[in-house]
UniProtKB/Swiss-Prot annotation:
Keyword Zinc applies: yes
Reactions accelerated catalytically: RNA(n) + a ribonucleoside 5'-triphosphate = RNA(n+1) + diphosphate
Lineage: Bacteria, Pseudomonadati, Pseudomonadota, Alphaproteobacteria, Acetobacterales
Organism: Granulibacter bethesdensis (strain ATCC BAA-1260 / CGDNIH1)
Protein name: DNA-directed RNA polymerase subunit beta'
Enzyme Commission number(s) from the entry: 2.7.7.6
């Protein structure tokens, strides 16, 4: 057996393993790996090209250069295998051992390992309790360190300079104390550390310490020491006595032509180390002066540093061409490093690439493959068939036949290709639909033919795109390609569950033309329409031109009733629609009414969706193919095209522009008169112009979409309306007006471009528009890179999220309701619960009976019923509340969107979620505007209009009537709710503080009626009582200045930022109201009528003026919103996923209570929220410049903002909990995608959020070994607590923490996955000191070690392996996994 093993060249160790451990190597281990010491820096002899003995390429140490041949040539051939040549000392064996065997260098003086020294926090520094600066001084021979103070006044580990040392030695004598320098000194300190004793001591210190900084330091040190104790490593191993040398084949030396050599940088670095080491040895032997030896030691330390991580300390060592040398760390790092270049991204053979062209006569599951390519790709299969059929006797003969392209080769190629799918891929592969399998059809020419319907999935077009072809070789691969990746199996998009195989462009136009509704059609009464009995008659009439495609006819339609038996019905329709009906599958749930209308792109998509849901996949594919044929055919026949005259400029354009210009003049005048500020004027101008642009666009659309008898329908409108090409925004610029432009900085130029492209732009207009356009191009380039990086981070954080079981049995879930925005339903309840599992029974509100029990998977019909029943809130299961230990369970995930069925075990939902969110990333803008640079920004909302008829209720109503008897809203969180007759909520609107309320409780309103209005550009401060104004702390020149506007010459009183001024530090500018008797007026909430003024407030009343209730005392301008400086688009999504704190964020109340203002600090204001019931107070410090949105005495609720601004996700989690956080993140991210019209299912975002919530922070350790403030994995924490409870001890208490995706990826359980993501050296250093074990649970780790991934079909293999090993243990067999018998495999 042993001999056999030797022949097969099997290594001693078994290749099957379940986990990988990383640890520091001890010097003994390094020596045991080594096959010999390297003593000389030489590489190879430049005359003979043979490696030098004992050099870096030595054959004696590393093995022979040629297979089974020693260096001197005494022993050749297999028969001498295993013999060591006595002349040259080389073992006769395979040359590939030069890839495996290592050597070592014995160092004359120990050196510190740079990873453990410089990687922050410095591990060596933590162990010996010195700072990195101090350590470097010792290691690089600048200072001595006291090792044993003896009876002197020195402290242990005190640093001494050379002079101080000599002085102390003179003072106390040479032997009174011991001091050392260099790595030896550090090593002796490390050797003196007793780990177990330290552990106990530090824990005791932790219990006693009170200072926070000290605690943090102790915790860090304790963690490190515990890691060492657990992994069994010794601290002194961080100092190296031996340096390992990697195998020579991994740092090759390649002869180039012309007698020169190309060598790996590592050889240079090793040579440096060896040279310096040898020199040091010699100097020590010669008893050279201390200073020389010390310098040499320092140089040795530097050369070893450069070998491990060049450039980490000091200047990088450079080669001959001034380029820094690539060290061992650089080999692992970055995109070109070992992890990402070779382990995660390998190149494959049996592949080719070519340009794609359209192949409309293909079936959906086919692609056209050029014969030339197929011949090359399927070579091995062809060779085997040629031999099998006896056309060729040997492989060589077969090869020759193929090269000559003999006729029989083509026949065999046809046979080989039949039923053998190939995979097509288009870069960039942004989601899994970027690789799909097709059956090849051989074609002439050199371009690959692609079916038009799959272009959406590949995001391909035919303007020169290229695609790659890959051949699945093994039977299993072919099986997976056919069953899982075939284009016919990928009809629905995994991102939103809608069909992705939808017709676009020409096909849509053709179908739209077929199903047009012309004015003639509308004007013909039904009974006057011609009647036809069969389709044949209709076709004959069309041929004879007695009817057109769009004439109204009555026809007999063959269809099925609800039971599915064939019936005939009469329908009123057009011949064109009958042609579509002919290809529609017959099914009771796919009625003719579905296509008996004008088919736009969206309608066609709905038809395909319905066919897929009710008739199944096969029918759907056939239908889609026929639809495509019909659409293309009709588009060609229709001959729709347009000329310049089809773009009609509305006649009213001129007067609209004149009207707006008049308004702008008026604003200018108001500004001159000092009624408004410059910022307000700018805002109003911009608003007026954007309204004008919209009106012109509206007029143009109205003009173009006019349909009259006898006049052909406008082609441009048909293209836009059908969804084939062009959007109203583009048409606006062609025939309306171009509108406002933005400067690159994001500000809007207030002079709009009045012309459109048809009229042509003036020079100035053209120049203004190039601004935005050029910026758009620059942005696109940035966007692609940013979007790719976001996707990469998402994949990395979610890659180990896999469906592991069917049901975790949790009772928890999330509450979902429809998403409203400004009274419009943006995402209905049925949309949000579709494909999810109920976590509670749903009750019918009228009868109170159970409609659907918990754990029902909501299908389309369920969702419709729930919405019809008027249910507004449903509780569903979610991955966020799933209790599976590794991965998530099927019930909590719900429906697999790409298949429309419950999700399978083993589905890699994490990666799917990451791709679904990342793939549309390139469509998101980098900023909030762009349509060829044209600024888009809605006129600021300044009123609320009813979106439905209904009855008004006002939530949190708190109003005062002003002198004109108008109700002014005084509440900070007032909402108007519209309900229908049954009392169901139809819409809900936020009404800001200071708005004029135009309706009231219980009023009946009609659609589009104004409910409230306000000034969008200022925040008012309003009084709720009448009285006399008194200024407090408003000192001229300190807190108050009179600003005079240069243009208008008018003055206004403005509160200035007073904290810069020494006199103003303690002042708190405010207004107060007094009544006739001179007392301060009391407000309704029983506080004094005092109003605090924040900087930039403009006073509207004079000191001593009389005011009425509802009057404005002061106003704070909202500054000229630059194209709304909210981070939009991609950066916003990244900001949310990275859980960054936005700048100028909101401060939210952590308890319910009343607001009080405490004593101010120098630069901060103190707000206290006092809970009336419990009496507890929470304090918030707010920088003085910020505008506080509450007044003294206001009542705030948990989670209400005290300072306006974007909310911080961490605060939401802390105050309101996980459900509120998920709600916030899901809605915020969806808002960004919705703006671009991208649909993504909520569950994908939830999967990512789940991964961001993996860690908890310990608040109270109980009887566990955790430390306060430590971050622990949630699962680990829960397991530990269960253990403690079983043993009757106190469990730990913790709170969830939200981590950004980058941080979460770097802190996964698997160090392999983290190291291959980012910051490789840091991750590996951490893992090595802790002696981490990677259990290979995620996808990435398994790809890196070259296994099948534990998802999809790989998860089945995994299960079988587990069953098998379980059986083995039961039988007591060894670890070799037996081949499963058919019976076991079936289990």
């Amino acid at each position: 057996m042993n001999e056999l093993m030797k022949i097969l060249g099997q290594g001693g160790q078994s290749l099957s393993f379940d986990q990988i451990k990383i640890q520091m190597a001890s010097p003994e281990q390094i020596r045991s790996w080594s096959y010999g010491e390297i003593k000389k820096p030489e590489t190879i002899n430049y005359r003979t090209f043979k490696p030098e003995r004992d050099g870096l390429f030595c054959a004696r140490i590393f093995g022979p250069i040629k297979d089974y041949e020693c260096l001197c040539g005494k022993y050749k051939r297999m028969k001498f295998r295993g013999i060591v040549c006595e002349k040259c000392g080389v073992e006769v064996t395979l040359a590939k051992v030069r890839r495996e065997r290592m050597g070592h260098i014995e160092l004359a003086s120990p050196v510190a390992h740079i990873w453990f020294l410089k990687s922050l926090p410095s591990r060596i520094g933590l162990m010996v309790d010195l700072t990195l600066k101090e350590l470097e001084k010792i290691l690089y021979f600048e200072n001595y360190v006291v090792l044993e103070p003896g009876l002197t006044d020195l402290k242990l580990h005190q640093l001494l300079t050379e002079e101080q040392l000599l002085n102390k030695q003179d003072e106390f004598g040479d032997d009174a104390f011991r001091a050392g320098i260099g790595a030896e000194a550090i090593k002796s300190v490390l050797e003196g550390i007793d780990i177990d004793e330290d552990k106990v001591r530090l824990r005791a210190e932790l219990k006693e310490t009170t200072s926070e900084t000290k605690r943090k330091k102790l915790v860090k040190r304790l963690k490190l020491i515990e890691a060492f104790a657990e992994s069994g490593a010794k601290p002194e191993w961080m100092i190296l006595d031996v340096v390992p040398v990697i195998p020579p084949e991994l740092r090759p030396l390649v002869p180039l032509d012309g007698g020169r050599f190309a060598t790996s940088d590592l050889n240079d670095l090793y040579r440096r180390v060896i040279n310096r080491n040898n020199r040091l040895k010699r100097l020590i032997e010669l008893r050279a002066p201390d200073i020389i030896v010390r310098n040499e030691k320092r140089m040795l330390q530097e050369s070893v540093d450069a070998l491990f991580d060049n450039g980490r300390r000091g200047r990088a060592i450079t080669g001959a061409n001034k380029r820094p040398l690539k060290s061992l760390s650089d080999m692992l790092k970055g995109k070109q490093g070992r992890f990402r270049q070779n382990l995660l991204g390998k190149r494959v053979d049996y592949s080719g690439r070519s340009v794609i062209v359209v192949g409309p006569e293909m079936k959906l599951h086919q692609c056209g493959l050029p014969k030339k390519m197929a011949l090359e790709l399927f070579k091995p299969f062809i060779y085997s068939k040629l031999e099998k059929y006896g056309h060729a006797t040997t492989i060589k003969a077969a090869k020759r036949m193929v090269e000559k392209e003999r006729p029989e080769v083509w026949d065999i190629l046809e046979e080989v290709i039949r039923e053998h799918p190939v995979m097509l891929n288009r870069a960039p592969t942004l989601h899994r639909l970027g690789i799909q399998a097709f059956e090849p059809v051989l074609i002439e020419g050199k371009a690959i033919q692609l079916h038009p319907l799959v272009t959406t999935a590949f995001n391909a077009d035919f303007d020169g795109d290229q695609m790659a072809v890959h051949v699945p070789l093994s039977l299993e691969a072919q099986l997976e390609a056919r069953v899982l990746m075939m284009s016919t199996n990928n009809i629905l998009s995994p991102a939103n569950g809608k069909p992705i195989i939808v017709p676009s462009q020409d096909i849509v136009l053709g179908l739209y033309y077929l199903s047009l509704e012309t004015p003639e059609f509308r004007n013909t009464p039904d009974d006057k329409a011609q009647a036809f009995g069969t389709l044949g008659e209709i076709e004959a009439a069309l041929h004879a031109r007695t009817v057109t495609l769009h004439t109204k006819i009555r026809a007999r339609l063959h269809t099925v009733d609800d039971q599915g038996s064939p019936i005939r019905v009469r329908v009123v329709t057009t011949p064109g629609r009958m042609l579509i009906a002919q290809i529609l599958p017959r099914h009771p749930n796919v009625p003719f009414a579905l296509i008996n209308k004008q088919l736009t792109k969206k309608n066609v998509s709905d038809v395909i969706d319905a066919v897929y849901r009710h008739c199944g996949q096969k029918e759907c594919v056939i239908f889609a193919d026929r639809l495509m044929g019909l659409g293309f055919g009709q588009a060609a026949k229709a001959g729709i095209s347009f000329g310049k005259d089809d773009l009609i400029i509305p006649a009213e354009k001129q007067e609209m522009i004149e009207k707006t210009a008049g308004e702008v003049k008026e604003f200018e005048q108001q500004y001159q008169d000092g009624l408004i500020t410059a910022g307000e004027r700018y805002n109003k101008v911009v608003d007026a112009w954007s309204r004008c642009t919209d009106e012109v666009a509206g007029a143009m659309m109205k003009e173009i979409s006019k349909q009259e008898l006898g006049r052909p329908i406008n082609s441009v409108w048909m293209m836009s309306h059908s969804g084939a090409r062009g959007s109203p925004a583009q048409m606006r610029q062609l025939a309306g007006m171009r509108g406002l432009m933005a400067k690159p900085s994001g500000e809007i130029i207030e002079q709009p471009i009045i012309a459109n492209f048809k009229e042509g732009l003036s020079v100035l207009e053209y120049f203004n528009s190039t601004h935005g356009a050029r910026k758009g191009l620059a942005d696109t380039a940035l966007k692609t890179a940013n979007s790719g990086y976001l996707t990469r981070r998402l994949v990395d954080v979610a890659q180990d999220c896999i469906i592991v079981e069917n049901d975790c049995g949790t009772e928890r879930g999330l509450t979902v309701r429809a998403v409203m925005d400004g009274g419009e339903v943006v995402s209905s309840l049925s949309e949000r619960i579709l494909g999810r599992t109920l976590s509670e029974d749903v009750l019918d509100p009228t009868t109170n009976k159970i409609l659907y029990p918990r754990n029902t998977l909501i299908e389309e019909e369920h969702a419709e019923k729930i919405e019809k029943a008027g249910i507004e809130v449903v509780k569903i299961r979610s991955v966020l509340t799933c209790e599976s230990t590794v991965g998530v369970c099927g019930h909590c995930y719900g429906r697999d969107l790409a298949r429309g069925t419950p999700v399978n075990i083993g589905e890699a939902v994490g990666v799917i979620a990451a791709q679904s969110i990342g793939e549309p990333g390139t469509q998101l803008t980098m900023r909030t505007f762009h349509i060829g640079g044209a600024a888009q920004r809605g006129a600021e909302q300044s009123s609320v209009e009813a979106s439905h008829d209904g009855i008004v209720t006002v939530k949190n109503r708190n109003v005062v009537l002003n002198s004109q008897n108008v109700a002014i809203v005084m509440s900070r969180n007032c909402e108007i709710v519209l309900a229908d007759e049954k009392g169901r909520e139809r819409a809900r609107y936020r009404v800001p503080y200071g708005a004029r309320l135009l309706t009231d409780e219980g009023a009946q309103v009609t659609r589009a009626q104004k409910l409230a209005e306000w000034d969008p550009y200022t925040l008012p401060i309003i009084t709720e009582r009448a009285g006399k104004v008194e200024y407090l702390d408003l000192l001229d020149g300190v807190t108050l200045v009179e600003r005079m506007d240069e243009v208008t010459g008018l003055t206004s009183k403005v509160v200035v930022d007073y904290k810069q001024n020494a006199r103003g530090v303690d002042l708190r500018p405010r207004l107060q109201l007094k009544d006739e008797s001179g007392d301060v007026v009391r407000l309704s909430n029983n506080t004094d009528a005092r109003y605090f003024l924040s900087p930039d407030s403009i006073l509207s009343v004079e000191n001593g003026a009389e005011v009425n209730a509802g009057d404005v005392l002061a106003r704070i301008p909202r500054e000229g919103s630059k194209t709304r400086d909210i981070t939009g688009g991609l950066p916003r999504v990244a900001e949310l996923f990275e859980a960054r704190r936005p700048k100028d964020h909101a401060v939210i109340a952590e308890t319910d209570g009343r607001v009080e203002f405490g004593k101010d600090y120098k630069a901060k204001r103190r707000i206290i929220v006092k809970n009336d019931e419990t009496g507890e107070e929470t304090e918030y410090l707010i920088p003085k410049g910020k505008h506080v949105s509450v007044q003294e005495g206001d009542f705030v609720r948990l989670g209400d903002p005290l300072v306006d601004g974007p909310r911080v996700p961490h605060d939401i989690l802390k105050v309101l909990g996980v459900e509120a956080l998920s709600d916030y993140l899901v809605n915020e991210i969806q808002d960004v995608y919705r703006l671009q019209g991208v649909k993504i299912n909520d569950k994908h975002i939830e999967v990512i959020v789940r991964q961001m919530l993996q860690k908890v922070e310990i608040l109270d350790p109980g009887d566990t070994m955790y430390l306060i403030g430590e971050q622990v994995d949630r699962l680990e924490f829960e397991a530990e607590n269960r253990k403690r409870e079983r043993e009757g001890e106190r469990p730990a208490v913790a709170m969830p923490v939200l981590q950004g995706i980058t941080k979460a990826s770097l802190q996964t359980q698997s160090f392999i996955s983290a190291a291959s993501f980012q910051e490789t050296t840091r991750v590996l250093t951490e893992a090595a000191t802790a002696g981490k074990v990677d259990t290979l649970n995620g996808l990435k780790e398994n790809v890196i070690v070259g296994r099948l991934i534990p998802a999809g079909t790989g998860s089945v293999m995994n299960r079988l392996r587990r069953i098998a090993s379980g059986q083995d243990e039961a039988k007591g067999v060894g670890q070799e996994t037996p081949r499963l018998s058919g019976q076991e495999a079936a289990e």
